[in-house]
């Protein structure tokens, strides 16, 4: 675990969410306690007045017109958790669930949900002590909130379901008891407050954003290495070209490519007398493609940062006036749109990378030995790794179909338009993983291509990247079992080690990055 992140409700930065996803501990700013208490007292006053308020003393969804007696309000809240814990599929990764828990924590702590202070304290304690609910990954349509996934979170808080504690999967009651925590008996509105909201979709989208950001930065490094391997030109990265268009992502990625290739002996060796006029688009248009991806990612990041700091419960409690107002903040359309944009971005990052690998293995395009092997024919070299990259890119293209354009009415047509944000966001981790493999294959191919130019060396930044790979994967002479090489390369991409090794601050999703 890294240093603790202090969550200030409504003011959590993207960098803090990233740190939390990467393993930072969580502390809730105690300054929120008064707002939480006032909100809970407002709900208690509403119950005492007996006025009908959705989810407080009524049924849910299509059953909203059914009034619930005061003596049954605790049972109502327990029942909604139990009945809505209807997810299926593999468990959501622990880092994503922890992110979801923190998102729910900061949402509830804003004092608009009517949660009891002790319930909020239990959620914070579970995060702090590493009790992570087992949350099946399928079952949310992204409106009315992420009901099924969040119900599996809430179930653990009442002692039902399962939780991960370290590497153990335990019954919820045992997990709480091990940490000397007591399950809660939920009061009026508390069950609904816990399971209504966009926190699952937002957590998945943020996790995808952070992984795709790492992939993009690695792809800038491998893209520069591919230019070197093919003895391509750095002229297309000239700042004057990109300033005339004005697209900020394009300007930033072109600057990164210039910095990565600065003072390369390989580039200088063919600056004069090269008969080629223009490189293929996969080399020449990297700033245009990668810059567009970066701009889209930054737009998605802004949407997700706002969502992560908002309140997506329903109804919302306004303590100043003593009201509980029904609305639709649970509808995750902003998250769905952001997830769709991220899917397009990671798809294109991988697509142009695969084209560079295909270019490198083709001697007619790269001027390098066929399939990057010294003895083609006897050896197949990088023939099939390029095929694997093509397969993964094709898979990502199929996954990139927008989820937000789909909608299936639910709850007897009461919830007649839904966002499908959960599905749209959940696919991002798999797409990022596919792209990491594609970039890893390009890393292997580009470094192999640069090896053919010895004793010429690349820039200091790219030589550091080459050394990082070569510390684990030797130059390919004759064919060998390729699988471990590919896993090693993709791990360097996924971990961020490749982007860090070059010693250059590469553009990221924060506008200041």
From Swiss-Prot:
Compartments, as annotated in UniProt: Cytoplasm
Main localization category: cytoplasm
Keyword Cytoplasm recorded: yes
Membrane-crossing segments per the record: none
Matches recorded under PROSITE patterns: PAL_HISTIDASE
Pathway, per record: Amino-acid degradation; L-histidine degradation into L-glutamate; N-formimidoyl-L-glutamate from L-histidine: step 1/3
InterPro entries: Aromatic_Lyase (IPR001106), Fumarase/histidase_N (IPR024083), HutH (IPR005921), L-Aspartase-like (IPR008948), Phe/His_NH3-lyase_AS (IPR022313)
Xref: SUPFAM superfamilies: L-aspartase-like
This enzyme's EC code(s): 4.3.1.3
Highest taxon above the source species: Bacteria
GO molecular function, one term: histidine ammonia-lyase activity
Major enzyme class: lyase
Protein keywords: Cytoplasm, Histidine metabolism, Lyase
Reactions this protein catalyses: L-histidine = trans-urocanate + NH4(+)
Modified residue annotations for 2,3-didehydroalanine (Ser): 144
Post-translational modification remark: Contains an active site 4-methylidene-imidazol-5-one (MIO), which is formed autocatalytically by cyclization and dehydration of residues Ala-Ser-Gly.
One GO cellular component term noted in the UniProt record for this chain: cytoplasm
Cross-link 5-imidazolinone (Ala-Gly): residue positions: 143-145
Gene3D superfamilies: Fumarase/aspartase (Central domain), Fumarase/aspartase (N-terminal domain)
PANTHER family in UniProt: HISTIDINE AMMONIA-LYASE
The family this protein is said to belong to: Belongs to the PAL/histidase family.
HAMAP family on file: His_ammonia_lyase
Descriptive protein name: Histidine ammonia-lyase
Source organism of the structure: Xanthomonas campestris pv. campestris (strain ATCC 33913 / DSM 3586 / NCPPB 528 / LMG 568 / P 25)
GN (gene name): hutH
